[in-house]
Amino acid sequence: MTISTTSSSTSSKTSSEKGDDLKGFSSSSSPASSRSSSATTPEPSSPTVLAAKTIESIDPFQPRKDYNENVLPAIPATEAVQPLTSDANTPDHWIARDERMIRLTGKHPFNSEAPLSELFSKGFLTPQNLFYVRSHGDTPRVTREQAENWKLKVHGLVEQEVELSIKDLKEKFPTVTLPITLVCAGNRRKEQNMVAKGLGFNWGAAGVSTGLFTGVYLADILDYCKPKNPLLSSFPSYDVAVPGRARHVVFEGADELPKGKYGTSQRLNWALDRCKGMLIAWGLNGEDLSPDHGYPLRLVVPGQIGGRMVKWLERIEVSDRESQHHLHFHDNKVLPTEVTADQARSEMHWWYDPKYIINDLNVNAAICSPDHDQVVNVAEPSTSSPQMLPLEGYAYTGGGRRIHRVEISLDDGHSWKCASIHYPEDLYRMYPIQGHEYFGTLDLSATEMSFSWCFWRLDVDVQADIIAKDVKVISVRALDEGLATMPRDMYWNATSMMNSWWFRVAVHREGENGNQIRFEHPTLAGNAPGGWMQRMNEAGLNPRYPQFGEAKAVESCKTDANTLAAAKEAKVDPKAIMIDPSKADTIITAADLAAHGDGEGPEPWFVVHGHVYDGTGFLKDHPGGDQSIRLVAGEDATEDFMAIHSMDAKKMLRDFHLGRLEKQDAAPPAATTEGEVLDLSKPFLDPKKWRATRLVSKQIISPDARIFRFALGSEDQELGLPVGQHVFVRVRSKNARTGETEMVQRAYTPYSGNTQRGFLDILIKVYFPSDAAATSAPAFEGGKMTMLLEKIDVSSPSDDLTIELKGPLGSFTYLGQQQIRWKPASAVRRVRKLAMIAGGSGITPIWSTLKAIADEVLDASNPSSPALDPIQIWIVYGNRTEQDILIREELERLRVALKGNLKVWHVLSNCTPENEANWSMGRGHITANVLRTHLPPPPAKPASEDELEDTLALVCGPPPMEKAVSDGLKQLGWDLQRCVVFF
């Protein structure tokens, strides 16, 4: 971006100053009613905001019942957001989110931060939609009715165990609101990962947000329950349990993770101290908590890292020992810098030392303006009106301490200037609120504790301070009231947490005659390339000890090789450690990859650096859940995998290596050419030749499902695809950036039958990309094939894109008249009963067979067909929610038309009595009992090997479902090899 800065005489207030002084607040905005949130707590109520008045009429230091935005920071309402297509195929598909948020761990789980400039522009209070999000798995889906009945259990070493609803909390204890800054311990982590990759993903400098949290003091709840025999001393060490002595308070949330629920703990003596400000909160900025931020109830611990603040809070236990939850030990630690990432993975003793745990935040600051890659046009020198450039940013610290000093250096730390500091939270000391209908007490006048960030600013003369002094870097550091400061040198650690070295922005003279200045931040959040640290790495320099400009080496910054090696991972080629040497020459064809490209199929394969890997064996153990693997099935996952995973994870990939993906020739294999005349009297498809087609229409079935229609050679041409078989679709497109032709190929089962002429319809789930920030690439670019099809303008064909079809392929075929060709040896059998079990998009191959059978029964135009008893068909179809059921109406129409010969049973895994009161079918998962109740019994064992059973089961769905179905069918007596077809 390019801006022109103002002169000192006309300098206007910047966005970061909104709410920073007594006259800089807008009275135009007010918080949205909590009724507008997607889910509400039992007593929705918006804060009352007074109409504009003159500031002179408002008495400071006098408690009031109203929130007055004339003198207090404007409360930001959650901005208009909706569920995103990038979440459509994840368990979080129902959550409304802001498309501007930068995703740090691919599509799922949702870990994100706002673009730094967007965050800073919002001022002191951050709207919920731009609040950073840290989640370890699926977000619990809590309905309003469930929230009204939500119970917080308080138990353990207490005189009185209780279960409290949110209504109970409001009635039993005083309501309190505090302005609190939340910070992820990984804030600014990517800077450490640019030195040596640690165990965590790439947070930028916007893993911080501030809001008004409303709830009750944790101390009030503990006083009510009365801890037994409390031990408040620091001796013995906190990792030593003293039986029967209440010493720790353990918190547990509702989120289910691979290694148990998320939980952590606080020392009892801290939890009993109201000065610590620990809240059990239900509100944020006058609204209910959003799902991503813990709806309906969470713990908030001012001055500590976000990892101590349990969301979706269900349980509080007073205990004689600290939390025993997995992530209480294996996360949120700053290990000694000598411990490499690999050591941290393999040497467990490091994680259990209480001296390495992170509680309080450390002092930190960042430059938010100028933004990364921002360009300032340099004005002609003027003595009367110098061109001024405001340097601005945030600073914070922990433990209730206050930032006392922010300093700026324009010469890499040789000299420093103090910036002015604005403390918006002090307005809640000058204008306290008591007895507010929503906030209760919002009054900092009785405490010196500081729980919020502050903003700093220093105006510099562009000519005198930047140009004349040939400034190469701008640095910022902050000091708190304990004189703790930000160090010059990075303290690298295996978790890459609590990074707080100087925040440096490189300065570049550009343009004709150097009439422009461009600013370069150290990194960009997530997987986005850019920043001076990456540039130094690529130049062979060490960004841990950066040198800006000429002759800027500082001897005291240097270190010996042994010290540096102890803090960095060994320089190894990550590509080499991911490859099994015995399979390095094994060639995997594009067709093989395409056959395993269904994210809900039994064996999802993916590509990293041109090699193919089978993710099946790691679906159950993947820390981010199996969705993270399924979402890249059949795709090139290089960017996401390399950016997120540690060297140890890259080594693990070798166990799943299959071989090298075949290279695609620049010229296409044999396909329809200009010189070839297509015989329209023959079927369109050819198993040995690609046939050119075009996309002629797209029918939207759901937010992430489409029926794509492809034209054949003529309106009367037959497709030539037997029922139950698949077709290859290949798309060639020209890369606008490189000019090269790229190819994507997938196998699909058609939605339309072979009787349809002139067209081929395919029902496809579209994998949409995650959204990018203004200058960053998306964490997930979407399904290559599905996004190519989605973006095609059917009304305006492009010469840069071609679509081709080839087929058929597959081992199962319905021949008609109750005849099926399948194994063994493509033998033909007559079937009388079919059990069809599908999950999600696995209904597609099931549908093609069902539709063909139904068409035969319902076709009255062919009286010569032999009269056969209709095939008896049972369908069990599993989905997450009712909205996820594909072709539901079509299934119902066939059920009615087939008059008792088709039975359909739907099973919803996310169906509960509260949100699906009218649902009359199955709930939960497809179990053996479901199969026993809603399918026919298995066929009798044939008298000889040559005799073929007349009953088959057809199965297609995600691997967990297929595994459960396999086990269930086997338990019920089905022969999986002879009688069960897995598509």
UniProtKB/Swiss-Prot annotation:
UniProt GO molecular function: FAD binding; heme binding; molybdenum ion binding; molybdopterin cofactor binding; nitrate reductase (NADPH) activity
Keyword NADP in annotation: yes
SUPFAM superfamilies: Cytochrome b5-like heme/steroid binding domain, E set domains, Ferredoxin reductase-like, C-terminal NADP-linked domain, Oxidoreductase molybdopterin-binding domain, Riboflavin synthase domain-like
Keywords: FAD, Flavoprotein, Heme, Iron, Metal-binding, Molybdenum, NADP, Nitrate assimilation, Oxidoreductase
Superkingdom of this protein's organism: Eukaryota
Spans annotated as Disordered: 1-50
Residues that coordinate or bind NADP(+): L952, A953, L954, V955, C956, G957, P958, P959, P960, M961
Enzyme class: oxidoreductase
Biased composition (Low complexity): 1-14, 26-48
InterPro entries: Cbr1-like_FAD-bd_dom, Cyt_B5-like_heme/steroid-bd, Cyt_B5-like_heme/steroid_sf, Cyt_B5_heme-BS, FAD-bd_FR_type, Flavoprot_Pyr_Nucl_cyt_Rdtase, FNR_nucleotide-bd, Ig_E-set
Annotated ranges, domain Cytochrome b5 heme-binding: 585-662
Binding locations of heme: H622, H645
Stated family: Belongs to the nitrate reductase family.
Record protein name field: Nitrate reductase [NADPH]
